[in-house]
């Protein structure tokens, strides 16, 4: 029987709410954070375009099991629309496809905002990760194909002007549901205003339940990163190698359960926790314990233990976390 290889890295679990700089791709960001923390496993909750900056929640270790909950959270973006040009990618990266000399007044833009609030229908950009017949739309677009991407419904909770620096640009903030393309908002508003438009700056500031106060920059992470052991000229670690102290870096990690604020949370006793660790159901005690829930999580000593459901006052685990 083949022996299973030992995992590389530390078994650290939790969330790093990374303030991604412009120019860095989401996959590149995950690799960088995984390397800095020397983590066994890492993943992100929601792609952020290389040209965009801001919040990219990165899950380490067992927090990767909670990624779907973070991806479903409401997003908040601040963005700038430059009027007068529609571009192939709906942002600065693309080539101009339509132009106009018209520039909208602040009053015209404000009058349009109610049309983009609530449940709206939008067509994702040609350059997007949407799959068309099994292929990514951006791959087809790069090959010169114009593809028909079906419109889909998204929800805009809030859209407001936050700046009007000059006639060419308007700054907005939007609070929206999963699946909303801000580039499509800019394109469609430009068309409705008769002047065309594209995104010239985009920053994500929230992915619920995380806020901008949770974000950490690359500089802050690197400032407390424990250096690698010194090596000789042949590339071998000089012995005895000092033990690396990750405590300052690990202090920037948010608890795995933070992504589950949307679920009912029930604390368990030590005896109940042991039963759940073994995959067994437990009867919930206490006046505040829910009798029914399609999804809920339980904790032990303040740490996330499991996600499951509650039926007739009994918690039944579906996913157990070893860190609990």
UniProtKB/Swiss-Prot annotation:
GO biological process: mRNA pseudouridine synthesis; tRNA pseudouridine synthesis
Residues annotated as the enzyme's active site: 49
Region annotation Disordered: where it falls in the sequence: 87-107
Family annotation (Pfam families): TruB-C_2, TruB_C_2, TruB_N
Catalyses which reaction(s): uridine(55) in tRNA = pseudouridine(55) in tRNA
Domain of life: Bacteria
Swiss-Prot/TrEMBL keywords: Isomerase, tRNA processing
Gene3D superfamilies, A to Z: Pseudouridine synthase
InterPro entries: PsdUridine_synth_cat_dom_sf, PsdUridine_synth_N, tRNA_psdUridine_synth_TruB, tRNA_sdUridine_synth_fam1_C, TruB_C
Single GO term (MF): RNA binding
EC number: 5.4.99.25
Stated role: Responsible for synthesis of pseudouridine from uracil-55 in the psi GC loop of transfer RNAs.
PANTHER family hit by this protein: PSEUDOURIDYLATE SYNTHASE TRUB1, TRNA-PSEUDOURIDINE SYNTHASE
Xref: NCBIfam families: TruB
Assigned protein family: Belongs to the pseudouridine synthase TruB family. Type 1 subfamily.
The name this protein goes by in its record: tRNA pseudouridine synthase B
Organism: Brucella melitensis biotype 1 (strain ATCC 23456 / CCUG 17765 / NCTC 10094 / 16M)
Name of the encoding gene: truB
């Amino acid at each position: 029987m083949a022996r299973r290889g030992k995992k590389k890295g530390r078994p650290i679990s939790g969330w790093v709410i990374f303030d991604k700089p412009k120019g860095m791709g989401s996959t590149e960001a995950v690799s960088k954070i995984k390397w800095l923390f020397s983590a066994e496993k890492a993943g992100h909750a929601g792609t952020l375009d290389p040209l965009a900056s801001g919040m990219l929640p990165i899950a380490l270790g067992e927090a990767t099991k909670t990624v779907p909950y973070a991806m479903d959270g409401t997003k908040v973006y601040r963005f700038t629309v430059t009027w007068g040009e529609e571009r192939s990618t709906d942002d600065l990266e693309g080539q101009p496809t339509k132009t106009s000399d018209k520039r909208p007044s602040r009053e015209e833009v404000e009058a349009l905002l109610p049309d983009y609030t609530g449940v709206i229908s939008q067509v994702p950009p040609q350059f997007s990760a949407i799959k068309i017949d099994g292929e990514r739309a951006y791959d087809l677009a790069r090959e010169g194909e114009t593809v028909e991407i079906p419109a889909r419904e998204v929800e805009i909770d809030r859209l407001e002007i936050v700046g009007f620096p000059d006639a060419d640009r308007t700054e907005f903030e939007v609070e929206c549901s999963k699946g909303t393309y801000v580039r499509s908002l800019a394109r469609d508003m430009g068309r409705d205003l008769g002047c065309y438009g594209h995104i010239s700056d985009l920053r994500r500031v929230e992915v619920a339940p995380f806020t901008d106060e949770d974000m950490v920059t690359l500089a802050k992470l690197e400032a407390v990163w424990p250096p690698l052991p010194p090596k000789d000229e042949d590339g071998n670690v000089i012995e005895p190698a000092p033990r690396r102290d990750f405590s300052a870096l690990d202090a920037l990690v948010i608890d795995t359960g933070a992504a589950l604020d949307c679920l009912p949370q029930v604390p368990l006793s030590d005896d109940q926790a042991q039963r759940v660790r073994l995959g067994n159901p437990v009867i919930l005690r206490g006046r505040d314990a829910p009798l029914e829930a399609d999804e809920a999580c339980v904790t032990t000593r303040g740490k996330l233990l499991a996600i499951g459901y509650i039926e007739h006052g009994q918690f039944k685990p579906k996913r157990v976390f070893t860190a609990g």
